[in-house]
């Protein structure tokens, strides 16, 4: 699978998670402490969510009631998260 396709799929998942949580982009951006434009870029795949700072990712996950693995696309990071969750 092409990595750009994988990143786009995960970013689309971010949008689906946000909508399932009943949050607008501006609401989620405020909860995560980021600009609406940044969230829009994550959702479109124009900005890689893997480049976000951990506190920002945790705020996004907290607001969406999801795990980091639900929004992270980097395979190495996902493997580390899986190992951490196993312990």
Where are these regions (language model features)?
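Recognition helix of helix-turn-helix/homeodomain-like DNA-binding domains
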Residues: 34-50
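Conserved hydrophobic/aromatic packing and binding residues within compact polymer-binding modules
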Residues: 14, 28-29, 39-42, 71
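A short, Lys/Arg-rich alpha-helix, primarily the initiator
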Residues: 1-20
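Short, charged recognition helix plus adjacent turn
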Residues: 2-4, 72-87
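DNA major-groove recognition helix of helix-turn-helix/homeodomain DNA-binding modules
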Residues: 54-70
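Alpha-helical residues within the helix-turn-helix
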Residues: 19, 30, 62
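Short coil turns linking two alpha-helices in DNA-binding domains
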Residues: 24, 35-38, 53, 67
